Amino acid sequence: MKVTAAFASLLLTAFAAPAPEPVLVSRSAGINYVQNYNGNLGDFTYDESTGTFSMYWEDGVSSDFVVGLGWTTGSSKSITYSAQYSASSSSSYLAVYGWVNSPQAEYYIVEDYGDYNPCSSATSLGTVYSDGSTYQVCTDTRTNAPSITGTSTFTQYFSVRESTRTSGTVTIANHFNFWAQHGFGNSNFNYQVMAVEAWNGAGSASVTISS
């Protein structure tokens, strides 16, 4: 639910991006999980029945938030989405986001981001090519940090798209298989969502998921 260790302190302050429109994310096929970590820091609305959500945030946010819709149990299936995302002056991600239970890991497939690339301050694992672009791949270790089990120490995995986009198909298996060469469990999944995260600035996003 947070970024790299080097920026952990930022996550305790504010989260936002430039602010025109609300964030709408939709995936009508089997949506059964609402990710709402500090969604009260902005204007977060959702409708599970249609697979849509919106998030709008302004300057002055006091902490990190992660909001989105998805599934209680993740998988390597592909996700197709389209989005409107405005976060150029915010530390923010538009990403496939989830957790693995054991070995515990937090993961992001970052399709677009604001003013902060998480791989700029993490350990590089190289690159992987998927869905028409190279992705930078990196990892970090969070120590005594908030997690799905309370406070724990766990590994983060990031794939950050070099040719950023706000629509397309994410072939999740390509990332999971690459990460698995570097300790990623690739099984025993916890939840998985299409998410928006931010911790400063102001912004908005709208996403429709169809897979």
UniProtKB/Swiss-Prot annotation:
It comes from the Eukaryota. GO terms for molecular function: endo-1,4-beta-xylanase activity. The gene is XYN5. One of its GO terms (biological process) is xylan catabolic process. Belongs to the glycosyl hydrolase 11 (cellulase G) family. It catalyses: Endohydrolysis of (1->4)-beta-D-xylosidic linkages in xylans. The active site is at 106 (nucleophile), 197 (proton donor). Residues 19-210 form the GH11 domain. The keyword Signal applies. GO terms for cellular component: extracellular region. Keywords: Carbohydrate metabolism, Glycosidase, Hydrolase, Polysaccharide degradation, Secreted, Signal, Xylan degradation. Its EC number is 3.2.1.8. It comes from Aspergillus niger (strain ATCC MYA-4892 / CBS 513.88 / FGSC A1513). Endo-1,4-beta-xylanase involved in the hydrolysis of xylan, a major structural heterogeneous polysaccharide found in plant biomass representing the second most abundant polysaccharide in the biosphere, after cellulose. The keyword DNA damage does not apply. InterPro entries: ConA-like_dom_sf, GH11/12, GH11_AS_1, GH11_dom, Glyco_hydro_11. It is an enzyme of class 3 (hydrolase). Residues 1-16 form the signal peptide. The lineage of its organism: Eukaryota, Fungi, Dikarya, Ascomycota, Pezizomycotina. It is found in: Secreted. Gene3D superfamilies: 2.60.120.180. This is Probable endo-1,4-beta-xylanase 5. Pathway: Glycan degradation; xylan degradation.
